[in-house]
Amino acid sequence: MKRLLIVALFLAAANFAQAQEKIEWLKFEEAVAATEANPKMLIVDVYTDWCGWCKKMDKETFTDPAVIKYINEKFYAVKMNAEDNKREFDFKGKKYSEAKMAATMRVQSYPNFVIIDPTLQNITQLPGYRQPTEFLEGLGQIVHNGFGSK
């Protein structure tokens, strides 16, 4: 009985620890406020509800421990639905919906990852599905090319 309890506690602790390891997604305006207080780049995951490759990124790439750690350390992560016209926020004195902001960022395919520097200027886009290793390589090149906060 004691062993069973120990095994159950171990499994519960492992599941709890695993559940805590996830990307800290923010709303766009939250990420902007955060980078003003503590400068880091933003990574904006622009997706749609119908996008199968977006769901594959969520399921496979964004659950990879190395991807989670790297994004949480180097970026403020944002999820943005390119077809959401309801939720509005202010940015640089203008009102935007998520759809309007995605269009302003010139996103034309999904998934698409817009990288924004700490001064809130778009740097580049990483379009399309990427496996964890490939995704980390792309992000690493951006950070190591001097765009990241030091």
Language-model regions, residue ranges each:
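Sec-dependent N-terminal signal peptides
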Residues: L4-A13
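Sec/Tat signal peptide C-region and signal peptidase I cleavage site
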Residues: N15-Q20
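Thiol-based oxidoreductase modules, predominantly thioredoxin-like and allied folds used
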Residues: K22-W25, D64-Y96
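A short beta-strand-turn-helix
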Residues: E24-M41, I71
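Extracellular/periplasmic catalytic domains that process cell-envelope and extracellular macromolecules
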Residues: E36-A37, K69-N72, M105-S109
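Short active-site neighborhood of thiol/selenol oxidoreductases, capturing the structured segment around
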Residues: N38-G52, A77
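Solvent-exposed loop/turn segments at secondary-structure junctions
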Residues: T48-W53, T61, A82-K86, Q108, ...
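Non-catalytic, surface beta->alpha helical segment in thiol-disulfide oxidoreductase systems
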Residues: E60-F62, Y96, K100-G148
